[in-house]
C-alpha cells in the first residue's frame, strides 16, 4: 500500500514550539537514538517499520526463553507449528522442543533499548532491568527503521546495520506536522474511544485511505476524513468538506481489512473485525498519548489464586505458564473483537464454563470467550508460595485469580 513517509518535520531548539501552551502534546511520539555498526548515532523521532510511531504501540516477536514451561505436565506437551494473526501481525507460534513458543508483546514505553542479535533475533531490554531474547515472529524484527535525525533529516536504517536502538523521553523542541488519529468507533458490542490505527496500519493524519469509487481509484489523507461507515462489503466515507463517497476494492474499505485498532483507556488495545465494525467518527486532537516517562518500571505479578478445592495460594504468579510481569498482556476475544489488556490493569480473572470473567482495575468487566489466556487452552498457573516452593495448577483447577 502506498504511504507517505515524509510526515515529520523536526524543529531544533530555538524554533517555535507548536502547542507549547498545551504542555507537551507531542510527548507520545517515539524518540531515541539509533547506533549503527559503523559507530554512527542518529537521534530523533522514530517510526518502526511503517506502523509503530507511539509509546503505546507494541513491539511484537516470539519469546526464545520459556522458563516456566518445564512445569507443564508431560501429558500436555507436544509439537506444533502455526502462523496466527495477532493485532494485524503474522506471528509464528511454533513449538520448540516440547514446549509451545509464546508471543512477545511489549509497549515501546516499557522498553529501554533493542539490540539486534542477527537477522531474526534481538535482545529487548525492559525498564526494571530484565532482558528478553526474542526471535522472529513479526515484521517488527528485521524491518527498516525510519529516524528523523535532528541535524540530517530523514534516515532509513536497515535492520542489519543497526547495533542498538535506545529510547528516551521525547523533547519538547520537536514539531510533528501530522496528527495522531483518534475518535469513536461504534460496534455491535458498543462504542470504543481513543487513538486509532486503521487496518492495523494507518495512524497519522497524513496516512492515506485507499479504495476505488465509481469514478476511479482514490487515496485520501485521513486528515480529510470525518467518518467511515460499513455498508455491506463497502465503506461510506464522509469527508470533512461534507462530501460522501462509497469506496470498495481494497483492504482499507472492505471485509479484507486487518482490523481497526483502538487504544481505549478502559481496556488497553482492542482490535475490531469487519463483522463487528459499524462506524468510526474521527476527531481533531493534538494529543499523542502518554510520555515515555509515564511508563513506570514493571514488576513481577503477585496475588492470590483460589483453586477448585478451596485452597488459597498466595505469592508470585505466572499466568498461562507465560505472563509473569506487569508489562505483559492478557489476551481474549468475543464477538469479533480482540482485547489485549496490560496485566497492570487487571484486577481478577475468573474461569467460567466458556472463557473467563475479567475484572479491570478501572471497574470494567469483560466476559471473554476465546484466547489462550482465558480459555481451556491455557496452560494453567504457577504460584511461588515461597521463594523455593512452587505450586502448579491446571486451568480447570483454577477458580479465581486476584492480582495485587
Language model segments and positions:
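Compositionally biased alpha-helical segments
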Residues: 22-404
Amino acid at each position: 500500500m502506498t504511504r507517505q513517509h515524509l510526515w515529520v518535520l523536526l524543529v531544533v531548539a530555538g524554533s517555535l514550539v507548536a502547542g507549547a501552551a498545551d504542555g507537551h502534546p507531542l510527548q507520545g511520539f517515539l524518540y531515541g537514538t539509533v547506533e549503527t555498526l559503523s559507530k554512527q548515532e542518529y537521534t530523533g523521532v522514530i517510526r518502526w517499520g511503517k506502523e509503530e510511531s507511539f509509546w503505546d504501540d507494541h513491539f511484537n516477536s516470539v519469546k526464545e526463553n520459556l522458563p516456566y514451561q518445564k512445569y507443564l505436565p508431560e501429558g500436555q506437551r507436544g509439537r506444533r507449528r502455526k502462523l496466527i494473526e495477532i493485532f494485524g501481525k503474522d506471528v509464528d507460534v511454533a513449538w520448540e522442543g516440547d514446549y509451545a513458543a509464546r508471543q512477545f508483546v511489549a509497549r515501546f514505553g516499557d522498553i529501554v533499548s533493542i539490540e539486534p542479535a542477527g537477522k531474526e533475533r534481538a535482545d529487548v531490554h525492559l525498564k526494571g532491568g530484565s532482558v528478553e531474547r526474542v526471535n522472529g515472529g513479526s515484521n517488527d524484527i528485521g524491518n527498516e527503521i525510519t529516524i528523523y535525525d535532528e541535524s540530517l533529516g530523514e534516515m532509513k536504517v536497515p535492520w542489519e546495520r543497526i547495533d542498538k536502538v535506545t529510547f528516551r523521553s521525547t523533547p519538547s523542541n520537536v514539531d510533528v506536522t501530522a496528527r495522531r488519529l483518534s475518535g469513536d468507533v461504534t460496534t455491535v458490542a458498543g462504542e470504543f474511544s481513543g487513538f486509532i490505527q486503521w487496518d492495523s496500519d494507518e495512524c497519522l493524519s497524513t496516512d492515506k485511505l485507499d479504495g476505488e469509487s465509481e469514478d476511479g481509484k482514490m487515496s485520501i489523507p485521513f486528515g480529510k476524513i470525518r467518518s467511515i461507515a460499513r455498508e455491506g462489503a463497502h465503506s461510506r466515507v464522509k469527508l470533512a468538506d461534507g462530501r460522501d463517497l462509497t469506496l470498495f476494492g481494497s483492504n482499507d474499505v472492505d471485509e479484507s481489512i486487518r482490523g481497526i485498532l483502538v487504544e481505549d483507556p478502559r481496556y488497553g488495545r482492542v482490535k475490531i473485525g469487519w463483522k463487528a465494525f459499524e462506524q468510526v467518527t474521527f476527531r481533531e486532537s493534538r494529543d499523542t498519548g502518554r510520555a515515555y516517562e509515564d511508563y513506570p518500571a514493571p514488576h513481577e505479578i503477585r496475588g492470590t489464586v483460589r483453586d477448585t478445592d478451596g485452597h488459597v495460594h498466595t505469592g508470585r504468579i505466572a499466568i498461562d505458564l507465560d505472563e509473569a510481569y506487569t508489562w505483559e498482556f492478557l489476551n481474549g476475544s468475543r464477538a469479533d473483537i480482540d482485547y489485549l489488556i496490560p496485566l497492570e490493569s487487571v484486577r481478577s480473572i475468573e474461569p467460567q464454563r466458556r472463557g473467563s470473567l475479567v475484572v479491570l482495575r478501572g471497574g470494567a468487566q469483560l466476559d471473554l470467550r476465546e484466547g489462550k489466556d482465558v480459555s481451556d487452552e491455557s496452560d494453567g498457573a504457577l504460584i511461588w508460595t515461597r521463594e523455593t516452593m512452587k505450586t502448579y495448577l491446571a486451568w480447570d483447577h483454577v477458580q479465581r485469580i486476584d492480582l495485587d
